[in-house]
Protein backbone atom coordinates (compact mmCIF):
# COMPACT_ATOMS: atom_id res chain seq x y z
CA UNK A 1 0.00 0.00 0.00
CA UNK A 2 1.11 3.55 -0.64
CA UNK A 3 2.59 5.78 2.01
CA UNK A 4 1.86 9.48 1.68
CA UNK A 5 4.27 12.15 2.89
CA UNK A 6 2.97 15.66 3.46
CA UNK A 7 5.59 18.41 3.63
CA UNK A 8 4.41 21.36 5.68
CA UNK A 9 3.59 23.00 8.96
CA UNK A 10 1.72 20.98 11.59
CA UNK A 11 0.21 24.16 13.00
CA UNK A 12 -1.15 25.21 9.61
CA UNK A 13 -2.38 21.69 8.84
CA UNK A 14 -4.25 21.52 12.15
CA UNK A 15 -5.77 24.98 11.62
CA UNK A 16 -6.90 24.00 8.11
CA UNK A 17 -8.36 20.72 9.39
CA UNK A 18 -10.30 22.59 12.06
CA UNK A 19 -11.67 25.13 9.57
CA UNK A 20 -12.74 22.28 7.25
CA UNK A 21 -14.16 20.13 10.04
CA UNK A 22 -11.69 17.30 9.36
CA UNK A 23 -10.17 15.20 12.11
CA UNK A 24 -6.38 15.03 11.68
CA UNK A 25 -5.66 11.62 10.17
CA UNK A 26 -1.91 11.88 9.76
CA UNK A 27 1.07 10.88 11.84
CA UNK A 28 3.35 13.81 12.56
CA UNK A 29 7.15 13.85 12.82
CA UNK A 30 9.86 16.52 12.82
CA UNK A 31 11.03 16.62 9.20
CA UNK A 32 14.68 16.44 10.34
CA UNK A 33 14.17 13.51 12.69
CA UNK A 34 15.71 10.13 11.84
CA UNK A 35 12.28 8.72 12.75
CA UNK A 36 10.92 10.22 9.52
CA UNK A 37 12.42 7.36 7.54
CA UNK A 38 11.08 4.63 9.85
CA UNK A 39 7.38 5.40 9.82
CA UNK A 40 6.36 2.84 7.20
CA UNK A 41 3.55 1.60 9.44
CA UNK A 42 1.81 4.96 9.06
CA UNK A 43 -0.06 5.54 5.83
CA UNK A 44 0.03 9.37 5.98
CA UNK A 45 3.00 11.16 7.54
CA UNK A 46 3.30 14.92 7.98
CA UNK A 47 6.95 15.93 7.70
CA UNK A 48 6.60 18.88 10.07
CA UNK A 49 8.93 21.84 9.58
CA UNK A 50 7.60 23.83 12.57
CA UNK A 51 10.47 22.86 14.94
CA UNK A 52 13.10 23.90 12.39
CA UNK A 53 11.26 27.14 11.62
CA UNK A 54 11.04 27.95 15.33
CA UNK A 55 14.79 27.38 15.79
CA UNK A 56 15.49 29.68 12.84
CA UNK A 57 13.12 32.36 14.18
CA UNK A 58 10.75 32.00 11.23
CA UNK A 59 7.06 32.34 11.99
CA UNK A 60 4.22 31.73 9.58
CA UNK A 61 1.65 34.39 10.34
CA UNK A 62 -1.76 33.71 8.86
CA UNK A 63 -2.17 30.72 6.55
CA UNK A 64 -4.90 32.68 4.80
CA UNK A 65 -2.79 35.67 3.76
CA UNK A 66 0.01 35.91 1.20
CA UNK A 67 3.36 37.13 2.47
CA UNK A 68 7.07 36.56 1.84
CA UNK A 69 7.47 33.93 4.55
CA UNK A 70 4.48 31.82 3.51
CA UNK A 71 5.69 31.98 -0.10
CA UNK A 72 9.20 30.88 0.88
CA UNK A 73 7.86 28.01 2.99
CA UNK A 74 5.44 26.85 0.28
CA UNK A 75 8.33 26.84 -2.20
CA UNK A 76 10.51 24.97 0.31
CA UNK A 77 7.86 22.27 0.80
CA UNK A 78 7.45 21.75 -2.96
CA UNK A 79 11.25 21.51 -3.30
CA UNK A 80 11.32 18.91 -0.50
CA UNK A 81 8.74 16.85 -2.39
CA UNK A 82 10.78 17.12 -5.59
CA UNK A 83 13.96 16.11 -3.76
CA UNK A 84 12.16 13.07 -2.31
CA UNK A 85 11.41 11.86 -5.85
CA UNK A 86 15.11 12.11 -6.70
CA UNK A 87 16.26 9.93 -3.80
CA UNK A 88 17.80 6.59 -4.77
CA UNK A 89 15.69 3.45 -5.00
CA UNK A 90 15.47 1.79 -1.60
CA UNK A 91 15.69 5.07 0.33
CA UNK A 92 12.73 4.97 2.78
CA UNK A 93 11.98 8.65 2.09
CA UNK A 94 11.87 8.21 -1.69
CA UNK A 95 8.61 9.24 -3.35
CA UNK A 96 7.35 7.86 -6.63
CA UNK A 97 5.05 10.78 -7.37
CA UNK A 98 4.13 14.29 -6.29
CA UNK A 99 0.57 15.43 -5.74
CA UNK A 100 0.10 19.15 -5.28
CA UNK A 101 -2.62 21.64 -4.58
CA UNK A 102 -2.75 25.22 -5.77
CA UNK A 103 0.03 27.55 -4.72
CA UNK A 104 -0.35 31.23 -3.94
CA UNK A 105 1.57 32.79 -6.82
CA UNK A 106 1.60 36.20 -5.12
CA UNK A 107 3.26 34.71 -2.02
CA UNK A 108 5.86 32.93 -4.19
CA UNK A 109 6.55 36.19 -6.00
CA UNK A 110 6.90 38.05 -2.67
CA UNK A 111 9.49 35.41 -1.70
CA UNK A 112 11.41 35.98 -4.94
CA UNK A 113 10.29 32.66 -6.46
CA UNK A 114 9.17 33.66 -9.93
CA UNK A 115 7.50 30.60 -11.39
CA UNK A 116 4.02 30.60 -12.89
CA UNK A 117 3.37 27.43 -10.89
CA UNK A 118 4.95 24.33 -9.43
CA UNK A 119 4.64 22.48 -12.74
CA UNK A 120 7.35 24.72 -14.19
CA UNK A 121 9.46 24.48 -11.01
CA UNK A 122 9.33 20.68 -11.13
CA UNK A 123 10.27 20.66 -14.83
CA UNK A 124 13.19 23.07 -14.31
CA UNK A 125 14.51 21.23 -11.26
CA UNK A 126 14.36 17.89 -13.09
CA UNK A 127 15.80 19.49 -16.26
CA UNK A 128 12.81 18.53 -18.40
CA UNK A 129 11.98 20.43 -21.58
CA UNK A 130 8.77 18.50 -22.28
CA UNK A 131 6.29 18.48 -19.42
CA UNK A 132 2.61 18.92 -18.72
CA UNK A 133 0.16 19.32 -15.89
CA UNK A 134 -2.10 16.31 -15.36
CA UNK A 135 -5.35 15.88 -13.48
CA UNK A 136 -6.26 12.34 -12.43
CA UNK A 137 -9.65 11.13 -11.23
CA UNK A 138 -11.32 7.76 -10.83
CA UNK A 139 -12.71 7.74 -14.37
CA UNK A 140 -10.86 10.48 -16.20
CA UNK A 141 -7.24 11.52 -16.72
CA UNK A 142 -6.50 14.82 -18.41
CA UNK A 143 -3.15 16.19 -19.60
CA UNK A 144 -3.32 19.91 -20.29
CA UNK A 145 -1.97 21.29 -23.56
CA UNK A 146 -1.46 24.72 -21.95
CA UNK A 147 -0.86 25.86 -18.40
CA UNK A 148 -1.12 29.15 -16.55
CA UNK A 149 -2.67 31.03 -19.46
CA UNK A 150 -5.69 33.31 -19.28
CA UNK A 151 -8.71 31.92 -21.12
CA UNK A 152 -8.70 34.91 -23.48
CA UNK A 153 -5.12 34.06 -24.56
CA UNK A 154 -5.65 30.36 -25.29
CA UNK A 155 -6.81 30.98 -28.86
CA UNK A 156 -3.44 32.66 -29.58
CA UNK A 157 -1.34 29.97 -27.88
CA UNK A 158 -3.04 26.62 -28.45
CA UNK A 159 -1.71 24.83 -31.53
CA UNK A 160 -2.09 21.38 -33.04
CA UNK A 161 1.53 20.77 -32.01
CA UNK A 162 0.77 21.51 -28.35
CA UNK A 163 -2.19 19.14 -28.45
CA UNK A 164 -0.04 16.40 -30.00
CA UNK A 165 2.69 16.98 -27.38
CA UNK A 166 0.13 16.59 -24.57
CA UNK A 167 -1.15 13.37 -26.14
CA UNK A 168 2.41 12.09 -26.60
CA UNK A 169 3.32 12.76 -22.97
Task: Identify the role of each PLM range.
Residues 118-143, 147-152:
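Flexible loop/hinge segments that line or gate small-molecule binding clefts
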Residues 1-118, 160-169:
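Contiguous, glycine/small-aliphatic-enriched amphipathic segments in soluble metabolic enzymes
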Residues 144-169:
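Glycine-rich phosphate/diphosphate-binding loop of Rossmann-like nucleotide-binding domains
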Amino acid sequence: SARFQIHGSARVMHEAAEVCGVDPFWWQVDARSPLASTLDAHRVVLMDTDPQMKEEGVELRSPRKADRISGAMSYHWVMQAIEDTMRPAGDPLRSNAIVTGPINKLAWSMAGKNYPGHTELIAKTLKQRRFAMMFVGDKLRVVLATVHIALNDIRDVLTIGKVHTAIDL
